[in-house]
Amino acid sequence: MRRKPQPDDAMTIKAQKPAAIRVVMPFVFRHWLKQPVMTAVIAFGLLGATVADLFMPIYSGHLVDALTKGAQDASARHDALIAFAAIVALGFTSIVLRMVGLQAIVPFTLRIMSDVARDAFQRVQRFSTDWHANSFAGSTVRKVTRGMWALDLYNDTILLALLPSLAVLLGSMILLGLHWTSLGLVIAVGALIYVAMTVALSTRYIAPAARVSNAWDTKVGGTLADALTCNAVVKSFGAEAREDARLMRVINRWRRRVNRTWLRYNYTAAVQLSVLLCLRGSVIGGSLLLWMAGRASPGDVTYVLTSYYIIHAYLRDVGMHINNLQRSVNDMEELVEIHDEPLGIVDAADAQPIAITGGRIQFEDVTFHYGGHRVPLYDGLSIDIRAGERIGLVGRSGSGKTTFVKLVQRLYDVSGGRILIDGQDIARATQQSLRSQIAIVQQEPILFHRSLAENIAYGAPGASMAAIEQAARLANAHDFILRLPKGYGTLVGERGVKLSGGERQRVALARAFLADAPVLILDEATSSLDSESEALIQEAMERLMKGRTSIVIAHRLSTVRSLNRILVFDRGEIVEQGNHAALIARRDGIYRSLFERQAMEFARITAAE
């Protein structure tokens, strides 16, 4: 009875996609063609060894015929020695040629694995912000590593196993058919039935189940990464048991899918062995009939049986190889999808590096909407930010503040209009040159699990230690760094978890100081810090903004009083703008309403304390 997709199995849909082998094989062959010489050496070595194996049954039959004539027959002794020498020579040739192929396939496969992993990483790095927001990092890592090792299995299966096996099968059937057409025809028909049945079962019966189990394998990796990355939150709520249970729910679903896949492999193997048993009976029975009819000598029967057992072994292996091939294809499918995924933002063909000197930013009639949203967030937005001007962005959540700075960084492309920096359209500039001249301090700074010095110098990789320390001093970070056991060599943990929120903020500010970019984006995050850290960060922020075009996303309005101009966003429109004094004077203004609400909240909290 055919299994119905389970309602909670969101991954079942993957089984409905076109055959993965039609997508994966061209992908791998493209990488083979990048190493034509190595591909030729491998094919020559392995096929040459296979041809040597093909002729061994012939000389085995000659040896048996010579032995049956008796040792007294001089010609028989001569024939036996010739057959023996040929068998040894063929065996030696097979070993040498096979070693040539094996030695060549090691660097061949390693280079492809390296290229595939590098290319996948490069593409993932350049995918859109939305893609990363909607993807588990752990799942992506699992797709790449699983696909990379599946490529090793794929190469071994095709080049070391399947190609030689098919050559032996074809060659043996031809040679056998030249001696006895009837037996050759029986083996040929049986082999074709076996191979066709194996391919059909692998692609139509096993592959859909394997796709689903692979999707759940990826989900297990994502669930693990999600819980481990947020371990501090798990501990703070004492939720270890809850996360254990959540993982086990995913693992149980994964186990059911994998169990189904593995059972399908077993059922397929049972069918394969049954077909081989029928073929064996037909060949042995046919050989006996030929011998009983006097149409075959003992040597002929030996040749037939030796050839058949070689064919039998290779046929059995072909079944296993096809299953392995299908398994490797399924394991690579998600990796190939990464390579086929379109990049979110692509440089124009004639893109040139942008040169930002003053930092004037102009939005000219900009229209923008997210993804498939019909209603645009921005519809004809225009604003001119002067070089060196310090701008605050204020508004309710979802009003368009964060989108504004993402468009400045060109993390998204506008739907209409254009954005200019120093008179240059950023859509015509290379992304790398644009973003390298815009420093950003995020609300939740993200640090690499590397040393503090490496994190500070991330925007200026060639910076000297003296420059790194000076940037840390300007960010009020130098003193706390020196108190750490290894100072600037201290590893900060994944995403900087070894540091407090205020310390991470100051490291991020030091990174921005060292980058020394003409445009600065500050996602203000002092509201969640203690008063001492807030004062240190506020002082560093004021120092950092001097002489730079600065855009501050303000979450606490008290931090924007000193800015030149404040832009008040509401539903994608700039509804108010001016300095703090001008905006607070508007009785019915949104800015004044937000400011008074925050002031009342602050007073309530202070009174409660």
Residue ranges and their predicted role:
Residues 34, 38-51, 157-212, 283-297:
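Transmembrane helices of ABC transporter permease
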Residues 10-21, 44, 52-65, 90-137, ...:
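Juxtamembrane helix-loop junctions of ABC transporter transmembrane domains
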Residues 29, 33-36, 126-133, 146-155, ...:
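An intracellular "coupling" helix at the cytosolic face of ABC transporter transmembrane type-1 domains
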Residues 344-356:
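Pre-NBD coupling/linker segments of ABC/ABC-like ATPases
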Residues 1-53, 68-87, 101-105, 109, ...:
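Membrane-integrated ABC transporters
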